């Protein structure tokens, strides 16, 4: 049997883990030695409930990171996003060293990654085969998040200079763009050519929508008790707050808009927050709102009449493709 290490950008939301956990679970069920790495609270909860091993954060001092959240939330493409988030050479060096420790200590035969810049660089440094599991607009050949705006503007931020300095220190050839480091020995694209189009020259395998739900997962009785005399709307906010202060990446706007639009409507609303707490400003929800930190996505999508979400790729896969549920996704421009 083989050893597989699943890595990702360690964001505190469920978008990336919900595409990797199903693959990891299948490999573990087949007897392979499987580990996942995402210590953020919400992903860690999902990984634990899937019965998978989540590796701890390697012990290494890390510098403060500086991120331009406004540019991250409005980035033209992944290259600008990485430039806005990972422009500090000191942070790139420390993050790369941490991920080299992680990969070396576990000793995988294969790294399976989704959007983890530093785990991809670590795999190159240690010469471990890399499988990249990406949505179409994360792929290096993509036209970006706002492709309809035409030609990409010149002079957008890039992390290439910082990344190449650290890569050279570790004997890895430079890249033209930092996004090129996501290039795996095998590309698996979550979605279809219609939902996640790429140029014909991109050598990828489309694997369709990947969604997570344990085979025995069912909805709690209180959802069934809501009855069917009124439409059931599922509101999924993703992470309402990514930091102690508001940032442009927060999905709290989804909850605010849903309450404003639906609190007096003749509907039942189920609000889920992906293992996140409901923000304090919503300490008392409207009487027709019902909150759960997490519910199995495919089951909830099949039960609801309408899904309102933050525009995350995995949410689109759950609602529109898996269950054919009408959806409104007001935040992410690429969807």
Show where each model-derived region lies.
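Proline-centered loop/turn at the N-terminus of a beta-strand
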Residues: 127-129, 186, 231, 268, ...
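A conserved, positively charged/aromatic
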Residues: 145-151, 180-182, 301
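Donor-nucleotide binding loops and adjacent catalytic segments primarily
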Residues: 24, 201-306
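Glycosyltransferase specificity loop/lid
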Residues: 1-122, 128-140, 147-148, 268-321, ...
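Residues that mark the start of a beta-strand
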Residues: 2-5, 232-234, 325
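Short, basic, glycine/proline-bearing loop/turn elements
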Residues: 9, 81-87, 103, 159-164, ...
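A nucleotide-sugar donor-handling region in carbohydrate enzymes
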Residues: 153-241
């Amino acid at each position: 049997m083989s050893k597989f290490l699943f890595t990702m950008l360690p964001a505190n939301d469920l978008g990336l883990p919900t595409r990797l956990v199903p693959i990891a679970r299948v490999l573990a069920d087949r007897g392979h030695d499987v580990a996942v790495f995402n210590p953020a609270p919400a992903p860690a909860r999902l990984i634990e409930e899937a019965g998978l091993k989540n590796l701890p954060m390697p012990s290494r001092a890390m510098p403060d990171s500086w991120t331009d959240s406004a540019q991250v939330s409005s980035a033209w493409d992944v290259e600008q996003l990485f430039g806005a988030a990972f422009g500090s050479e000191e942070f790139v060096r420390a993050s790369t060293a941490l991920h080299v420790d992680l990969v070396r200590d576990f000793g995988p035969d294969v790294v399976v990654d989704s959007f983890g810049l530093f785990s991809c660089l670590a795999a190159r440094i240690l010469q471990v085969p890399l499988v990249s599991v990406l949505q179409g607009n994360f792929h290096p050949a993509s036209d970006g998040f706002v492709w309809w705006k035409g030609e990409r503007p010149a002079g957008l931020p890039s992390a290439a200079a910082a990344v190449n300095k650290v890569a050279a220190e570790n004997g890895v050839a430079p890249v033209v763009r930092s996004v090129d480091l996501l290039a795996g020995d095998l590309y698996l694209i979550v979605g279809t050519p219609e939902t996640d189009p790429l140029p014909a020259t991109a050598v990828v395998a489309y694997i369709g929508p990947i969604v997570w739900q344990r085979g025995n997962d069912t909805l709690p009785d209180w959802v069934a008790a809501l009855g069917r005399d009124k439409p059931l709307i599922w509101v999924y906010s993703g992470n309402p707050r990514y930091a102690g202060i508001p940032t442009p990446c927060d999905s709290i706007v989804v909850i605010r808009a849903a309450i404003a639009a639906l609190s007096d409507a003749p509907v039942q609303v189920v609000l889920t927050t992906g293992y996140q707490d409901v923000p304090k400003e919503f300490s008392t929800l409207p009487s027709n709102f019902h909150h759960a930190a997490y519910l199995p996505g495919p089951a909830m999508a099949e039960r609801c009449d309408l899904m309102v979400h933050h525009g995350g790729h995995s949410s689109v896969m759950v609602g529109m493709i898996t269950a054919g549920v009408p959806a409104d996704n007001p935040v992410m421009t690429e969807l």
